[in-house]
Amino acid sequence: MCMKTRINKNTLACAFWTVSMMAYMFQCYQRELATLIVPCLATFLLLESNHMKFQSYRSWMPLYCFFFFYLTISGIISYINGSSIGSMLRFYLILLAIPLAQCVREPNFHAEWIVLKILAVVKASTVLLTWIDVFIKQDYQSYRMWAKSTGAGDIYILNGIPRVQILGTSIFVTLFICEFMKERRLTFYGALMAVTALAAGNSAYVLGIFAFVVFYYGPVLLKWIKKKHWKLIFVIPISIVMVTVFGFYSLRSMKVKAEFSNAVRVEQIQVLTETNPIIGSGLGHNVSGGGVWRQYDGDTYFELQTLYIYNQIGIIGLGTFYLLTLIPYARQKKRKKLMCYITYLIYTFFNPYCFDSTHIFAVLLITNCVE
């Protein structure tokens, strides 16, 4: 009877994972699917609560309890000061769920991983087919009108290269990293994930892949240098050429985008740092006003999403969050998971791909797939 209950529970958890990931991947084509992501993901976490392994870290649970009470008090104060209860509850649940999701050690995560790989291949195919069609025709107007009208994202051409920046692509860098670390080599699936991330054309995705390659191969390169390995005769020139080409292309793209994108980020730094640096302005704090480039009244997503969290809970809250999510990885003998998570934090810092459902998916994948 116990075995039957366990099987049913695991199957049910996998079913909610499937619906949540399907909604996440394909919300760009049917916006109503977005409403299923959080409820299904929350149900999955509840069903996996018996697989949460945090008791081995003595300092973790007291720190999490402190974080829980800190967010509760911050949320109450913010609500009293007129902040939206919906926004407050949203960030309250997300900030509490991410560290818990990181503690899920599902021994049978293979099923969830296979489901995700299938969904990701389907999504990658649609992105790449769109990219190819736009590249051949050199016309993106119809696609862009669709993306803008439905809230699916944006599709355009920059320097002759299409950018298919639609919802659901921000997880592809993490999928590439997890597949590479899991298989210890570049597989066809891993390459497909990386190519799809590059097809999206977001500079953050490029940064994520580049940072991972540097973190992973940096120590290997140092060992080769110490041992005076002959492979360096071929590796160093190739690396120099690749870095030069990458740098030239990045600088060229940045010149085109800098006038608007970087100006918006600078403006957001000014807006989001106008807060109490220690405790913030309160959980769910509604940013008001704006600047030359944009109005921010009621916004909950920013290019600098990390700074928005800082705006709400200050250094104490943000610092505690980072400790909670770094401790479990830092205390492991192998630091591969820590490297992958730091890579995620780096490439999402300047973009709105953290502190949301993507962040929860990322830590679940890093914890259960990276070996």
Label every PLM stretch briefly.
Residues 252-313:
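Long extracytoplasmic/lumenal interhelical loops at the membrane interface
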Residues 2-253, 298-371:
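Hydrophobic transmembrane helix bundles of membrane-integrated enzymes that assemble
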